[in-house]
């Protein structure tokens, strides 16, 4: 099995497993069924690119924040000096992140893991992610910055 086919099959398994675990949550099931259709289309775009000699991964990791509110032992971002207590002046703006999200979707990317620093520090980028409902954005967070308003936003924009 070629790498592109293997990765596409992995995406199918993710959706199958998520659907099984969401049987009692109708809102989640609707989201997953819609997303599964979109992911099949993305898989086709990846296979077409692969046939032309360009490999497009189904998953990307986007370090959207340079600041974090914690100092966790073993933090990879602090160890690599990509995370600090305040933002870098060169941090990419939310509009550009939104453009990158749309470009990734057009190529056939299915998931963009939002990491950092602490990604909840960048509500502006989270809003841009919500504007690209065709992609799924797992958020790698320490969870300490969740507010009731933010939880409502995540519920409203399930991607």
Each PLM stretch: what is its role?
Residues 3-150:
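Conserved alpha-helical substructure of the radical SAM core
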Residues 134, 156-159:
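Glycine-enriched alpha-helix->loop->beta-strand junction motifs that scaffold or abut catalytic
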């Amino acid at each position: 099995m070629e790498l592109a086919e293997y990765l596409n099959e992995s995406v199918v398994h993710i959706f199958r497993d998520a659907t099984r675990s969401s049987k009692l949550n109708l809102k989640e099931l609707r989201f997953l069924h819609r997303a599964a259709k979109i992911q099949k289309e993305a898989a086709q775009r990846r296979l077409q690119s692969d046939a032309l000699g360009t490999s497009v991964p189904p998953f990307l990791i986007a370090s959207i924040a340079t600041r974090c509110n914690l100092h966790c032992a073993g933090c990879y971002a602090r160890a690599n000096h990509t995370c600090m207590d305040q933002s870098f002046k060169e941090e990419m703006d939310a509009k550009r992140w939104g453009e990158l999200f749309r470009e990734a979707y057009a190529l056939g990317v299915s998931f963009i893991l939002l990491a950092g620093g602490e990604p909840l520090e960048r509500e502006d980028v989270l809003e841009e992610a919500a504007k690209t409902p065709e992609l799924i954005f797992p958020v790698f967070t320490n969870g300490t910055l969740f507010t009731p308003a933010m939880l409502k936003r995540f519920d409203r924009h399930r991607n």
